[in-house]
Amino acid sequence: KTGVTAALSLLSGFLITNLLIKNAVARPRPFDTYTQIIPLIIRPKDYSFPSGHTCASFAVALVCLRMLPGKWGILPVVLAGMIAFSRLYLGVHYPGDVLAGFLVALLTSTVACRLMRRTFSPQKS
């Protein structure tokens, strides 16, 4: 159940972030705007806003936080936070991009968890 919920959150986050918002906003990446920034990875070719990596990692991590016990729910959130920070450190996102990616993930994980809870909850007669 957790895996299906995480996959639903991840897929919906990808669709919202990469297919809708990125193309609608079309925000250049920091290294495109500020030439003194040298990215530490191969230059991504898509737009900056919102961060797809942050959205993807938190889309799964927040589902884990809600559905898994104890450290098994917290560890993915810590790892997602590290991924979010890395996007800033690598010079490929602005802080607002990372925040927006997190907010999309918060939305998709919440909707996915509620949908799965309704789908798999015992029916009252």
What are these regions (language model features)?
Residues 38-125:
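Membrane-embedded catalytic cores of phosphoryl/pyrophosphoryl-handling enzymes
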Residues 1-15:
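Interfacial segments of alpha-helical transmembrane regions
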Residues 14-29:
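Transmembrane alpha-helix/helix-exit interface in multi-pass inner-membrane proteins
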Residues 3, 16-17, 56, 60:
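Amphipathic alpha-helical interface surfaces
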Residues 25-40:
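Membrane-interface interhelical connector segments
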